[in-house]
Amino acid sequence: MNHEVMNLFNPQAPAQTFDSIRISIASPEKILSWSYGEIKKPETINYRTFKPERDGLFCARIFGPIKDYECLCGKYKRMKYKGIICEKCGVEVTLSRVRRERMGHIELAAPVAHIWFLKSLPGRISTLLDLTLKDIERVLYFENYIVTESGLTSLKLHQLLSEEEYMLAIDEFGEDQFTAMIGAEAIYELLAGMELEKIANDLRVELSETTSELKQKKLIKRLKIVENFLESGNRPEWMIMKTIPVIPPDLRPLVPLDGGRFATSDLNDLYRRVINRNNRLKRLIELRAPGIIVRNEKRMVQEAVDALFDNGRRGRVITGANKRPLKSLSDMLKGKQGRFRQNLLGKRVDYSGRSVIVTGPELKLHQCGLPKKMALELFKPFIYARLDAKGYSSTVKQAKKLVEKEHPEVWDILDEVIREHPVLLNRAPTLHRLGIQAFEPILIEGKAIQLHPLVCTAFNADFDGDQMAVHVPLSLEAQLEARVLMMSTNNILHPANGAPIIVPSQDMVLGLYYLSIVSEKEPGEGMAFSDMGELHHALENKVVTLHTKIKGRVKNIDKDGKEVAKLYDTTPGRLIIGELLPKNPNISFDIVNQEMTKKNISKMIDQVYRHCGQKETVIFCDRIMQLGFSHACRAGISFGKDDMVIPDSKLRLVAETEALAKEYEQQYNDGLITQGEKYNKVVDAWGKCTDRVADEMMKRIQAVEFDPKTGRQRPMNSIYMMSHSGARGSANQMKQLAGMRGLMAKPSGEIIETPIISNFKEGLTVNEYFNSTHGARKGLADTALKTANSGYLTRRLVDVAQDAIISAVDCGTAKGLTMQPIVDAGQIVASLGQRILGRTALVDILHPVSGEVIVEGGVMIEETDVAKIEEAGIQSVQIRSALTCETRLGVCAKCYGRDLARGTPVNQGEAVGVIAAQSIGEPGTQLTMRTFHLGGTAQVVDSSHLEASYEGTVEIRNRNVVHNSEGHLVVMGRNMVILIKDGSGKERVVHRISYGAHIFVDDGDVVKCGQRIAEWDPYTRPILTEVEGYVGFEDMIDGLSVTETADESTGITKRLVIDWRANPRGADLKPAIIIHADKKGEDIAKYKGGEARYMMSVDTILSVEPGAHVKAGDVIARLPMESAKTKDITGGLPRVAELFEARRPKDHAIIAEVSGTIQFGRGYKNKRRIIIEPNDETLEPVEYLIPKGKLFHFQEGDQIEKGDYILDGNPAPHDILAIKGVEALASYLVNEIQEVYRLQGVLINDKHIEVIVRQMLQKVEITESGDSGYIPGDHVDRIELDEINDNLIAEGKRPASGNPILLGITKASLQTPSFISAASFQETTRVLTEAAVSGKIDTLQGLKENVIVGRLIPAGTGGTIAQIRRIAAVRDNLIVDERRKSSDSQVAKIMLTNMTTGATAE
């Protein structure tokens, strides 16, 4: 800001503010300009007087006085001598605070290289000089000479010479014919002599001429660094230092300990070493010591300086007295304990306290109970001020005494002070923004903080000894923000998914559920009640019970606000809950007239919030909590061991399964199935058995029983009530208590074949107990690791997304995403409505039949619109998304849509990036850590058949079926899809049917719910013949490509294809089954214009004999699923991290880049070459190499579409981006990440993941540079490139082009435009080195940079303040310009009059 100009009019201008920070390499002049004097001695303080030594590391003359306004010798004391320099000791009389600010310097006797620019990759010095790092080090550490001028000799420039070679060269050419130097001086000379402009031009010319890719890379790398130096105005020789700055002494203090010893900062040791060696070197040079000694000393100075800047980067680590490595300047910045993360981003807070929490059920939602003792301590300054104002005390000392003695008036004043003064409560770990909320304190006796039960979910708190911290907002602004934004009553909805988070849990749910139960044959059944008074009367007199079926009249208001009453079939309990509902036309009694499970209560609160607003909701929640507690207490629900009912059929089911397992064992012994198949089948059978026992148990537990004596319904099973209501416990836990525990996993994730048949009620046998402890211990170990991993993921997410802030209302983009319901295994997992609610429509959404507009383009889709869209049967909707938003910095409100935590359109300045990161990271601890090893385990076998889950009409897409010899319809296509449509023609379910499956329905058939549609063998993959004919074998040579194997345990033989390439004789074989058209086997049957030849892969089991007659659709060979078994399903947290880091998965899928025909090329030893001949003539054929043992679906001549998988597996996200584009990538990442969370039942809105993916897609890799001055391979911000291209096109120049690239979150964080943010994240030294060389400017746009420089963040209220400041600055500039113009015009007038008067005088 133009403060210089402002000073003309206002001499008392404020301290300079700044808009950006620039980092560059310090020149020697700069270092001297900072310094207040040279440090010549290594001494610190005098051991007798404890005064700093003159010219030493703590010298008072250089750094300033030790005591405020007092020189060292004591001649001048007090304020009146301010600014005088004492003639005796040379110390300036001023504040001692300057010892934190003043720097000194060390003048080096020989230059040294700065280790950051030497060693931090890529080594800047070596790249600039085009030498290897090793060579530079040899010169720097005095092993070799380097030729700096070759003259007319045969020596080359930059040639290295050893001592002998140097001597020989001098003998040969003479000393003055060439120059060779050694040490940092040599490098200094070379760097100083560089003409950067010329080098840059030469490199550009060379780059345009070269064709080798390796050379291009090298040239580009060098050119980048040369250009960085040119643009930033840094000089290369500044990377070699002649003076070293010394940081102020109070930042490396010397602290006296008791016992006369001192604790010192490591830096003092490191500086001392440098000074000692430097002084010794000076003396040696003065004494004209032999070259070899001087050189050794110079090397030692270089090493000392290296250790000071970055200890351990080169050579051995320098250790202190206690064998601990010394902390160098770099270590001061790095890591969790470094300056950035310890002091700048995280600070300790005063006015805070912590204590244990207990429940406070009588509090209102916005209150918390604060112990009096704590309040007295926290609000001390306010109390002192009030005591003074009321005249109880005249000094702070007096006030202090009153407070310490706890005078009665102090308590009255404390009450006044605390009233309406919110405090912040925080529970660690603070995983999302609901971990800190504001409450109004209520003074309580005791020492524990009371917390409102409803906010426990948000804090993830329980009362088993958790502690919480209290913070007092001091300034008026802070109090205002706490009250308006952070009050617990404002945080009713969860920012991750928009569902209520102030929801009753545990006892409250149980109480409400108990109230809402209906029982048969209760007293008073069928009575009718006109109002609540009557009902309470009847309940008091036990005429009816809470669960009696009755009719009740419920009053509500209609749209016009008139009272209406309606009669409902209900129970007294439900009417009592209904009494609390706010009166609103949109809220009917129906939402209470059902069993109040936790889900239903949540829905009810959601409805109340949407229709009645925040205030009503808060009152309603408080009332419902009271009701829940009181009825849970009255009901007295508890359970004993007899409530765990073991089903009678358990023994029968277990016996049946044991028989099955024996049968599979026998089949394996007979050689009908392999070891792996047996394992699969056994695990499968036990899995089914466990589920059936659990089902039987559930049937027993939830059965309605009647008391034969009274005829009344027996009370419901308590355990079932707790589980079913969602209060505590789950079906799985009930299964283990009263069913059977089932299969257990080993620590490796494999499933143990023998299940645990007992349950906890019966008790486990020793073997069973041992089996169950096996996997359980792994679970505990995982939990500890998980917390750390989850926290690290959150940190990376916050870092990458911290500058995504809502910065504009509408960016006006025409791009968006297409949303469809997510279907998994035929079930709709996420409906279209869930996915589009609260998003902005991209274009008008029209009714498919009537064509009327349901939602206009650019308008947010509300709940009512969703209902209309689903009614209309629309299957896909185009919406705006953060991914396609075109705002320059941040995201616009339209693309983001609804602020989930408030249910309204998002405000400007909302930090949506951080919210997204927290929403994704917070549930991280709930995800599993397990990588599922499918040793062909139960998970492979999802199912072996498919049943219709809806009634409707079948439609088959890409139909490709034949009748095989048994008359079954067999699927021959690889992408055949069966859809079931309901009466209105709406798609209900979609199933992809696998190759080789048998189907029982055809196009147009009508199916009933539960009817079997298809089945397949889950344990093997078949190879089918597509034509009828006779089998022939090709290249099937016994012992070479085929072998008859006998199963070792059964002795039964089968034919197996073995790896024929292992033997040199078999190198050219291509084992195949061919189908002949006739019995003689002369000509091969034709199919689709090609021959019916089926290549066999390793491990295929042959199912036919040569000469056998087969029909189309018959199985000729099968591949056991075991070859697909070792696929590890990376689940849970590691999978989420893998996706966000955009790592290439192990064994990733190979995706076709073009549409075309598959051809097989010549294979390699263990790779198979596949060529796609494109359908588009203009494109080149594409080749892929595939490992030979891999399962490969296609035959020669098959058609393949762009984006189809050639090889199955998890695709690499980069491939999806390159082949299918941004939208496909976005939907892939969103769906994959959501799938992991969905498995754990965690709801996260898509938009959060989209915001993170947007941050990962910020960069473009330049392919053609045009006239932009970029170099191909540069990574440029997408929006920056668009702006530069617009300018280039406007000037009629060639624009640059590039491809979008996907960066993992760590990489993206390190590549943010802000170097402060990147340095505080990871790899601090590398980031700062890079930034310094290129002279980067940090414009302080994101949140972290602003926190670090100590400003308000540019989000929320801080964003508004920043905006006001910007507007003010612009206006200031305008005013200054105006004033300057007016003063200029006055001067001009005077000059004119002077000129005219001068002219007339002449």
From Swiss-Prot:
GO MF entries: DNA binding; DNA-directed RNA polymerase activity; magnesium ion binding; zinc ion binding
Protein family membership: Belongs to the RNA polymerase beta' chain family.
Protein name per its UniProtKB record: DNA-directed RNA polymerase subunit beta'
Listed GO CC annotations: DNA-directed RNA polymerase complex
Organism: Bartonella quintana (strain Toulouse) (Rochalimaea quintana)
GO biological process terms, semicolon-separated: DNA-templated transcription
The protein's assembly and partners: The RNAP catalytic core consists of 2 alpha, 1 beta, 1 beta' and 1 omega subunit. When a sigma factor is associated with the core the holoenzyme is formed, which can initiate transcription.
SUPFAM superfamilies, A to Z: beta and beta-prime subunits of DNA dependent RNA-polymerase (SSF64484)
Binding-site residues for Zn(2+) 1, renumbered to this chain: 71, 73, 86, 89
Keywords: DNA-directed RNA polymerase, Magnesium, Metal-binding, Nucleotidyltransferase, Transcription, Transferase, Zinc
Cofactor(s) needed by this chain: Mg(2+); Zn(2+)
Enzyme Commission number, as recorded: 2.7.7.6
Signal peptide boundaries: none
Class in the EC hierarchy, top level: transferase
